[in-house]
């Protein structure tokens, strides 16, 4: 349509969604972007709707959630959509990050895109934590108390900073109001960061591809080819999400959060949502509080250093067998950390957590740089051997 190329706003839509040239060999692993955009849209719409009926008060917050569930038209559907889409959001983000590591999407010229994506993930973690506090059940109260108390590990100003965040000497009305305001604001900041992520991707060289080579030689417009390909996974995602929302809405939640917050009674175990368990396991595996906090935040921030740690001359690990094995071990270790984060702080889980933490950081700091250098040398040896063999064959043909 001519209007898409003449209207100043629709021209942007046309260049990013309709006529955007994409490599012809993209697999379904490149569909996570559209699914994540859908998740963010669902979260913003359902979140704004829930905010219309929520009361950020320690006496009324729990009851306002029950009011939404029982009295608001389709309130149960809106709440379960919000909570289960949050889980889906993180699940897809982990797959998106994993695909980026596997195919080397962090390497130049996409380093800026990778950095913005990591900032998006950090903002997501903050938003999820703030949202977990709002229902003000037992896990909400004690989770907020434990996580905010981590800042007391900062020398000199730690305790003052914790009390400043609380607005008092414990979690109270001021805390809940602040968390609600920030939880409402952050998704819109996330949307702005997503736009920056998209601009950074399309204003460099566009999407990468499974081969790890330039896709400029063979490209297709995004619409209708990849638009319909995205719709396939969107419909599949909506089907799976509907199964969770309608048949097992609380499968990924914690039953303790259906008990009203009681500051006089500590729950048997204080655990965050499942998607934050790996980082919680790293925190708990370190006896020293300050070191544990540093490592927990470092576990996320170290992703920013990937472009500078990987010295390989090949993009991605699809043709690097040693790095491929190391990546699969890293994924398995991440899942182990997720399991350990839900366990009680006791032997042997403490020891397993420490070993998994060492392996997690070793993958980034030691294994990736070392294997990339080894594989570079092996590639040079193979290239020299191949060129020498070709030269000998040519000489033998000439002599004949």
UniProtKB/Swiss-Prot annotation:
The UniProt record lists the keyword Oxidoreductase: no
Keyword Membrane: yes
Name by which UniProt lists this protein: Cytochrome b
Superkingdom of origin: Eukaryota
Cofactor binding annotation: Binds 2 heme b groups non-covalently.
Transmembrane portions of the chain: 32-52, 76-98, 113-133, 179-199, 226-246, 290-310, 322-342, 349-369
Miscellaneous comment: Heme 1 (or BL or b562) is low-potential and absorbs at about 562 nm, and heme 2 (or BH or b566) is high-potential and absorbs at about 566 nm.
Source organism phylogeny: Eukaryota, Fungi, Dikarya, Ascomycota, Pezizomycotina
Subunit details: Fungal cytochrome b-c1 complex contains 10 subunits; 3 respiratory subunits, 2 core proteins and 5 low-molecular weight proteins. Cytochrome b-c1 complex is a homodimer.
Pfam families: Cytochrom_B_C, Cytochrome_B
């Amino acid at each position: 349509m001519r209007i898409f190329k003449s209207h100043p706003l629709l021209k942007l839509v046309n260049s990013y969604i309709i006529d955007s040239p994409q490599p012809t060999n993209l697999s379904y692993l490149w569909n996570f972007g559209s699914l994540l955009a859908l998740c963010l849209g669902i979260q913003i719409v359902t979140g704004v709707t829930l905010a219309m009926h929520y009361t950020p008060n320690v006496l009324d917050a729990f009851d306002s959630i029950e009011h939404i569930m029982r009295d608001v038209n389709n309130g149960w559907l809106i709440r379960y959509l919000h909570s289960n889409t949050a889980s889906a959001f993180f699940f897809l983000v982990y797959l998106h990050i994993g695909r980026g590591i596997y195919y080397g999407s962090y390497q130049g010229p996409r380093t800026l895109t990778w950095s913005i994506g990591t900032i998006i993930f950090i903002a997501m973690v903050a938003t999820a934590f703030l949202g977990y506090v709002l229902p003000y059940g037992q896990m909400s109260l004690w989770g907020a108390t434990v996580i905010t108390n981590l800042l007391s590990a900062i020398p000199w100003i730690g305790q003052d900073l914790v009390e400043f965040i609380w607005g008092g000497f414990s979690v109270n009305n001021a805390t809940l109001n602040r968390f609600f305001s920030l939880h409402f604001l952050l998704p819109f900041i996330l949307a702005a960061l997503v736009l920056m992520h998209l601009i950074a991707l399309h204003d460099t060289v566009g999407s990468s591809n499974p081969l790890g080579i330039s896709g400029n030689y063979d490209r297709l417009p995004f619409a209708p080819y990849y638009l319909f390909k995205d719709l396939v996974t969107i419909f599949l995602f909506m089907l799976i999400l509907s199964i969770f929302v309608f048949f097992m809405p609380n499968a990924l939640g914690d039953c303790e959060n259906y008990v009203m917050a009681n500051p006089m009674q500590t729950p048997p175990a204080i655990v965050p949502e499942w998607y934050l368990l790996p980082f919680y396991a790293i925190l708990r595996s370190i006896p020293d509080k300050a070191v544990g906090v540093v490592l927990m935040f470092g576990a996320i921030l170290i992703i920013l250093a990937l472009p500078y740690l990987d010295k390989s001359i090949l993009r991605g690990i699809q043709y690097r067998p040693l790095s491929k094995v190391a990546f699969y071990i890293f994924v398995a270790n991440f899942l182990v950390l997720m399991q350990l984060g839900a366990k009680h702080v006791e032997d042997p889980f403490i020891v397993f957590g420490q070993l998994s933490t060492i392996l997690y950081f070793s993958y980034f700091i030691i294994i990736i740089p070392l294997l990339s250098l080894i594989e570079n040398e092996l590639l040079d040896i193979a290239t020299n051997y191949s060129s020498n063999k070709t030269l000998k064959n040519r000489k033998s043909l000439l002599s004949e």
